[in-house]
Design a protein with these regions (language model features):
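Mature catalytic domains of secreted/periplasmic carbohydrate-active enzymes
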Residues: 1-432
Length: 432
């Protein structure tokens, strides 16, 4: 459980809960290895043996405008990119290190064009920054470090100074929030103070100087949204690779949250990973999250040459096709009122401004759909994919018709589902 620590938070969060869908990008020199972004520690690779990826990183096909167009077409409203991951390699031109994209064969800052492309396509900009750094000479070796099992190395490096690394961390965050204009999201990753390997302990808020870090962040960019992973409570929580069973609560109160999910089984480019989620599954995850008051941050791991994998682009396009017709059942929507329970195999999303209820059909019902609590309150209903009317059904409580709640509205549903619609949605105009 996270410690009960908090500092200043953002004042403008409405855009985030309105957007509901964002792009996550995990990109770095691990894309050359093409077998997971944690490859350095999974395979216990030394800095020297990891160096060829740095020496050969030349993303000659990098077109961030195309990335931004793909995200926009998928219905996404913001994009978050890894400025530095746990291996310590920086995509931005940091003055505090030589371990950066400008010193690779690619020879340029890769973050600035990403920021410009996002803004050109109307996307808000987010920066992921790893609190961990396996390359930095002062980052203390612990149980996550690639050299964790190298006892002579651990003994030789026992004097590493966390204070020096902490100053580096703070300095890089200052650079990111100073040199690229308005930043909408700061996605810090991650704390693990509860871990204990016997010979070393995990790291958390005190190690990062998180309170001081976040005070600096608020001085530089008061309205940037910051996640919870520094162990200091901020603006939103980040369930990873799972869908919460209900709206997330902390200390008994609902909080803003965003589920981050991969397209396959890896965050970074993983050539041989075949665990691709179907567009239908991803759409259901998006809807499920919105029905519980949450966002979805959907990840793509670009190739070493700077492109989205064709399978990733096809998935984004399929999500975008659905969003083209159904965006208003997602954006600006949230959990429905508690007295309106969704039918079996359905999710409700609710727009509190328009008073419209959206019924997302995860399974196709036979002929009738019963909406408890809405008898006499349905002014009109229609399918969103084509705007066709869904008529109110008629039923009797006796004879061949089932007994239903007296306060239920009944919608007459076609026997066949619409062709080519991953998740059909009925828009219900509720009488106020």
């Amino acid at each position: 459980m996270l410690p009960a620590m908090q500092t200043r938070t953002a004042t403008d969060t409405a855009w985030f809960t309105d957007a509901r869908l964002g792009l996550f990008v995990h990109w770095g020199i691990y894309s050359l290895a093409a077998r997971h972004e944690w490859v350095m520690t999974r395979e216990k690779i030394t800095n020297e043996d990891y160096r060829p990826y740095f020496d050969h990183f030349d993303p000659d096909l990098y077109d961030p405008r195309q990335w931004a167009r793909d995200a926009r077409a998928a219905g996404m409203q913001y994009a978050v990119i890894t400025t530095k991951h746990h291996d310590g390699f920086c995509l931005f031109d940091s003055a505090l290190t030589d371990y950066k994209a400008t010193n690779t064969p690619g020879g340029r800052d890769l973050i600035r064009p990403f920021v410009e492309a996002c803004r050109a396509e109307g996307l808000r900009v987010g920066f992921y920054y790893s609190l961990i750094d396996w390359h930095h000479p002062e980052f203390p070796v612990d149980g996550h470090h690639p050299r964790r099992d190298d006892l002579p190395f651990r003994e030789a490096e026992a004097g590493r100074d966390m204070a020096k690394y902490r100053a580096y961390l703070h300095g890089q965050v200052r650079e990111l929030l100073t040199n690229y204009g308005q930043v909408d999201v700061l996605w810090l990753d991650f704390s693990y103070s509860w871990r204990d390997w016997g010979w070393s302990k995990g790291k958390g808020a005190d190690d990062w100087g998180a309170h001081e870090l976040l005070e600096m962040v608020r001085d530089l960019q008061p309205n940037v949204l910051v996640n919870n992973r520094s162990e200091v409570r901020q603006d939103f929580f980040t369930p990873e690779q799972y869908q919460p069973r209900a709206w997330m609560h902390v200390d008994g109160a609902p909080v803003m949250w965003e589920a981050c999910q991969t397209l396959n089984g890896s965050w970074g480019y993983d050539r041989d990973n075949l665990d691709w989620k179907s567009p239908g599954m991803l759409i259901r995850m998006l809807v499920d999250g919105v029905s519980k008051g949450g966002n979805l941050l959907l990840n793509v791991g670009p190739t070493a040459r700077g492109e989205f994998d064709p399978r990733a682009r096809a998935t984004l396009a399929a999500v975008g096709s659905w969003m083209h017709h159904h965006a208003r059942a997602v954006r600006g929507c949230t959990q429905a009122p508690a007295d309106l329970p969704a039918p079996p195999d359905c999710r409700y999303t609710w727009n509190p401004k328009t008073g419209r209820l959206y019924v997302h059909l995860f399974a196709w019902p036979f002929r009738h759909l019963f909406l408890d609590g809405l008898a006499g309150k349905v002014a009109y209903a229609q399918f969103l994919h084509d705007g066709s009317e869904v008529r109110l059904g008629e039923y009797e409580e006796a004879g061949h018709y089932p007994t239903v709640r007296a306060d239920a509205a009944v919608l007459a549903i076609p026997v066949q589902p619409p062709v080519g619609v991953e998740v059909p949605v009925i828009e219900v105009f509720v009488r106020r």
